[in-house]
Amino acid sequence: MLQHSLSQAEAQARLNLAESQDGFFAKVRGSATNRLARRNCTYEAWNDQSLAAKAAALLDPEDQVDIVILDPSAEGGMPHTRPGLICLPAYYPESKLKETLAHEMIHISQKRQPTLWAARASNEGWSPVREVLPEFWASRLRLNPDTFGTLYAWEKRYVPLPVYIREDKPILREIEVRWFDIKEGIVKGSPPTTFTQTHGPLGHVQAEHPYELWAYSK
């Protein structure tokens, strides 16, 4: 039996509420590079929310999360989370729903229980970054609604930086992870040896932030 889905107006209202809670797009608007990366993206609730009902049927009702279907161009067509919401692009393949929802529910937990996940970060060698990043690199960081808020350093020294490959023509899906060495004050192209020894070789989507690392290794 399919679950109830929100109307387009209800879905848009949930998005507006989420923005009032996390201020993600206020931050995007304050970043020239991130605004440019979303120049062809429309972040609005889609007129057909029926996919949300199919996705909701795969979740436990106790998860207490709403699913919103967005314009297919929103966030480059990438599923993501906002406070209390899982956001999926229109026309997302139903065959991928189960795996994607499991991934996004990890991010929902990270938003709802920040203290718990901060403790895990500390236990696994991560610490919040207090230092100011070099402006050249800070301006190129791709803002991600799933990890928005806190940068982490591996071994209190190495900060993964998900940066756009091209600053002049940034594309949301085209990033690379550089590593800022706090001690040396320089940015390196390869992860520290200890990180690779611990986690193995990772793609950029896993390496960009510990929250993504854990969501992909669910």
Segments (PLM) and residue ranges:
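Active-site scaffold of zinc-dependent metalloenzymes
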Residues: P61-V65, L70-A102, I106, K111
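Soluble non-cytosolic domains of exported or imported proteins
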Residues: A45-S50, S95-K96, T100, V205-P210
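Auxiliary, metal-adjacent structural segments of Zn-dependent hydrolase domains
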Residues: R29-P83
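Serine-dependent carboxylesterase/thioesterase catalytic core
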Residues: Q110-R120
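Metalloprotease/metallohydrolase-associated module, dominated by Zn2+-dependent proteases
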Residues: S122-K218
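N-terminal mature-domain "stem" immediately C-terminal to a signal peptide or N-terminal signal-anchor/transmembrane
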Residues: M1-Y43, Y211
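Short, solvent-exposed loop/turn and secondary-structure capping segments
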Residues: P79, R120-A121
